[in-house]
A protein has these predicted regions:
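Conserved GNAT acetyl-CoA-binding A-motif
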Residues: 148-160
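Conserved active-site alpha-helix within GNAT-family acetyltransferase domains
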Residues: 162-181
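Extreme N-terminal basic, low-complexity initiation segments
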Residues: 2-6
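Acetyl-CoA-dependent GNAT
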Residues: 45-53, 61-128
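Conserved acetyl-CoA-binding loop-helix of GNAT-fold acetyltransferases
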Residues: 126, 132-145, 169, 173
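A short beta-loop-alpha structural element at the N-terminal edge
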Residues: 23-56
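Short hydrophobic/aromatic beta-strand or adjacent loop that forms the aromatic wall/cage
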Residues: 190-194
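Cysteine-centered motifs
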Residues: 7, 14, 20-21
Length: 203
């Protein structure tokens, strides 16, 4: 019946937490609010081991010498301070940060020499219960919109590791092209891969 169908649809929606509660996107040029900073810290700790290498073993969002990675006594504190000075897109539910994405402007590195002064997406974290629901795609779209408004004409770049299939699938859907691969950069069988957002005049 129609009633049964409506009940089934409602049940499906309520398996997606962010569709059942008040959620909103917040865009900032850095994090100063201590409550937001603490919520981001908790999210970083929760997602730490999802990254290769773990975030707690890194010293910045643009680190390239992975041989220097080691677990730090202060955990992710150094990494947290690094991202809080960057542009950020926050996904909040009921006023609590459940996902975030950060990016740098005027970014330059030798592995992206063909794309100088790009806007470089650095970190994306989504609370485990909120994954697989399209939030990552929304965050990418919001970052792209923010970049277009603040830095028109800048190319969008990012990197990940080759075994991160979930993110590479999203990047393909968003129209990003692989432009550099560093073989075994993060360990045997784990490459560092650089991407750039396609533009209309790209061939």
């Amino acid at each position: 019946s129609v009633e049964d169908g409506m009940c089934a649809a409602a049940a499906l929606v309520c398996r997606l937490p962010w569709m059942c509660c008040e959620s909103r996107i917040v865009v900032r040029d850095g994090i100063e609010d201590q409550k937001e900073k603490e919520e981001i810290r908790q999210l970083l700790e929760l997602c730490d081991q999802d990254f290769v290498p773990p975030l707690s073993h890194r010293n910045s969002t643009s680190q390239t010498n992975w041989a220097e990675t080691e677990e730090k006594t202060d955990g992710i504190a150094e990494y947290l301070e690094n991202i809080c000075s960057q542009h950020v897109v926050l996904w909040k539910e009921e006023g609590v940060v459940r996902a975030f994405m950060t990016w740098k402007d005027h970014f330059n590195c030798e592995n992206l020499e063909a794309y100088p002064d790009s806007c470089y997406l650095t970190t994306l974290c989504v609370w485990p219960d909120y994954r697989g629901q399209g939030i990552s795609e929304v965050m990418y779209a919001e970052a792209e919109k923010d970049i277009a408004a603040k830095f028109p004409g800048s190319r969008i770049t990012l990197r990940t590791w080759s075994t991160n299939g979930a993110q590479e699938h999203i990047l393909d859907k968003l129209g990003c092209s692989l432009v550099r691969r560093l073989k075994d950069d993060r360990g045997e069988g784990i490459d560092t891969v650089y991407f750039v957002k396609k533009e209309e005049n790209d061939r």
